[in-house]
C-alpha cells in the first residue's frame, strides 16, 4: 500500500506558510514505514527541532483504479478517517530552498498517524465535514472539508492519472490553518464530526 498526500489544499494554510497557491493539486508520497503503529507514542526525530502537526481527513481506497472519472470516484472508497501528517518543518524549509523533494521531512518513520476509520455512509455530506485537532485539550486546528480547494472525488480522479490506486491505499487530503510545533509531553487528539478518532502522546 501507499500513502498519497495532498499539499496546499486549504487557502488559509497556504497563507500561513506564505506559499504560492497551486494551479493543480500538490502531490507527494509517504512510504508505508511512515505509519505510526497503533497505540504507540510519537518520538520526535533527532534530526529536527521543529516538527509540526498537520491534521487531515483521510480516505481509504477499496479497489484498483486508474484514470478514474470524477463522477465515479465515490465508488472507490467506503471509509473516511482522520490523521496527522507530521512534518519536520526546519528540514522541509532547507529542502525547499534548494528545490529538492520533501520526502525526508514528511516520510520519516512515524510521520503518518492514522486514526480509526468510519463508514462513508455514516456522513450526510463529505463536502461539509468538521474536524479538529486538540493539543493538551485546546483546539489548535479547526477545519471543514468545504474549504478544500480540490474535493475528495476530484483528488482521487487527479491522482489516478499518475498513480494506479490499489486496495488499501490511503489519501491524506490536506491540512487547514493552525499548524504548529510539538514538544515532548504534548498530548494530541483528533475529532471528525465530534467523534474522537485518535489520541497521541509526544515523547
Sequence positions of predicted segments:
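Switch II (G3) loop of P-loop NTPases
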Residues: 175
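Catalytic-core "active-site belt" of small-molecule-metabolizing enzymes
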Residues: 1-162, 166, 170, 178-203
Amino acid at each position: 500500500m501507499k500513502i498519497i498526500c495532498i499539499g496546499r489544499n486549504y487557502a488559509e494554510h497556504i497563507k500561513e506558510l506564505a506559499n504560492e497557491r497551486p494551479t493543480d493539486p500538490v502531490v507527494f508520497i509517504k512510504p508505508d514505514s511512515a505509519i505510526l503503529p497503533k497505540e504507540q507514542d510519537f518520538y520526535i526525530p533527532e534530526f529536527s527541532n521543529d516538527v509540526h502537526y498537520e491534521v487531515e481527513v483521510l480516505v481509504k481506497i477499496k479497489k484498483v483504479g486508474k484514470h478514474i472519472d470524477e463522477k465515479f470516484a465515490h465508488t472507490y472508497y467506503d471509509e473516511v478517517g482522520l490523521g496527522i501528517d507530521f512534518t519536520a518543518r526546519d528540514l522541509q524549509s532547507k529542502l525547499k530552498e534548494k528545490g529538492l523533494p520533501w520526502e525526508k521531512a514528511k516520510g520519516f518513520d512515524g510521520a503518518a498517524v492514522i486514526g480509526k476509520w468510519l463508514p462513508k455512509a455514516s456522513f450526510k455530506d463529505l463536502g461539509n465535514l468538521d474536524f479538529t485537532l486538540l493539543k493538551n485539550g485546546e483546539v489548535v486546528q479547526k477545519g471543514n472539508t468545504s474549504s478544500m480547494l480540490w474535493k475528495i472525488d476530484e483528488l482521487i480522479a487527479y491522482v489516478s492519472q499518475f498513480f494506479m490506486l490499489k486496495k488499501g491505499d490511503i489519501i491524506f487530503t490536506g491540512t487547514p490553518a493552525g499548524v504548529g510545533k510539538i514538544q515532548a509531553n504534548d498530548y494530541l487528539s483528533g475529532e471528525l464530526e465530534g467523534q474522537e478518532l485518535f489520541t497521541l502522546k509526544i515523547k
